[in-house]
Amino acid sequence: MREAAGLEARGLKSPPILKGQDGEGSLQVHQSDDMKIEGAKVFAVYGKGGIGKSTTSSNLSAAFSKLGKKVLQIGCDPKHDSTFTLTGMLQPTVIDILKSVDFHAEELRPEDFVTQGYNGVQCIEAGGPPAGTGCGGYVVGQTVKLLKQHHLLEDTDVVLFDVLGDVVCGGFAAPLQHADRALIVTANDFDSIYAMNRIIAAVQAKSKNYNVRLAGCVANRSKDTDEVDRYCDVVGFKRIGHMPDVDAIRRSRLKKKTLFEMPDEEDIVQCRAEYIRLAEKLYAGTDPLAPAPLEDRDIFELLGFD
């Protein structure tokens, strides 16, 4: 009250209270009904930056394709390397391609922005705005709009969004507007679990207005899962996958390949089987989870330093 009176005395107005669709502080714009993805199961993959989301997403897309599903993977990162192991190359981004035609989308053909990758997986890199400018939500929206205009979602069984780092602003939370389930990639360490906790809070905020629900988490590049499991037990979450820390996964990325294209070594075969199991579980449908994210202080007490 004192602050408001001081502003009025100087002829200034109090700052507005921002309250959007997702609660106080939100300016998230509600998507129009004609932008909804229908007929496909839609997953959004999140996690701490550098945790292996793109590797996980690409191998999961390959696993879905091995189950006979028609898959579309959408990379949502300015690095545009989400589909790198599926296509064996860095694709140009949707935004770069639109710039080349002065944003006249009607001049584009599907082959201009979609590349067919391993085992028929359709790959697209949405990209992102230049550093410090624009909004990732706009990029995702333009990509979905382009796919709808070219009817590329009509015969698709699975759409998988691979989303930039652990950014949980309204823009990079945009894929949650389209997703049925959100999957979090984590590791058995404090920083990864801390990021997962923030992502859970973001998904829970979105679930008030959209259909998205949490499917669970995958412990990636982790020998053990005790810290992940301890966190999940406390907040009411679930680990639904575990990818061990094996060198074969690193080597597959260096060779620009998914694990399904690598030699039949024992550790590779085991990892493939885990991806197939995870794909089967996700496609069959997982129970919607509603964990209660912890306050920062509580995470430190649970997993932090003694």
UniProtKB/Swiss-Prot annotation:
Annotated GO MF terms: 4 iron, 4 sulfur cluster binding; ATP binding; metal ion binding; oxidoreductase activity, acting on iron-sulfur proteins as donors; oxidoreductase activity, acting on the CH-CH group of donors, iron-sulfur protein as acceptor
Residues reported in the UniProt entry to bind [4Fe-4S] cluster: C135, C169
Cofactor binding mode and count: Binds 1 [4Fe-4S] cluster per dimer.
Database matches in SUPFAM superfamilies: P-loop containing nucleoside triphosphate hydrolases
GO biological process: light-independent bacteriochlorophyll biosynthetic process; photosynthesis, dark reaction
Top-level enzyme category: oxidoreductase
Region (Disordered): 1-31
Binding residue positions for ATP: G50, I51, G52, K53, S54, T55, K79, N220, R221
Entry cofactors: [4Fe-4S] cluster
Statement: the UniProt record of this protein carries the keyword ATP-binding: yes
Origin superkingdom: Bacteria
Pathway as given in its UniProt record: Porphyrin-containing compound metabolism; bacteriochlorophyll biosynthesis (light-independent)
UniProt cross-references to CDD domains, sorted A to Z: Bchl-like
InterPro entries assigned to the protein according to its UniProt record, in alphabetical order: NifH/chlL_CS, NifH/frxC, P-loop_NTPase, Protochlorophyllide_ATP-bd
EC number: 1.3.7.7
Binding site for Mg(2+): S54
Family membership noted in the UniProt record: Belongs to the NifH/BchL/ChlL family.
Function description: Component of the dark-operative protochlorophyllide reductase (DPOR) that uses Mg-ATP and reduced ferredoxin to reduce ring D of protochlorophyllide (Pchlide) to form chlorophyllide a (Chlide). This reaction is light-independent. The L component serves as a unique electron donor to the NB-component of the complex, and binds Mg-ATP.
Subunit structure: Homodimer. Protochlorophyllide reductase is composed of three subunits; BchL, BchN and BchB.
Annotated protein name in UniProt: Light-independent protochlorophyllide reductase iron-sulfur ATP-binding protein
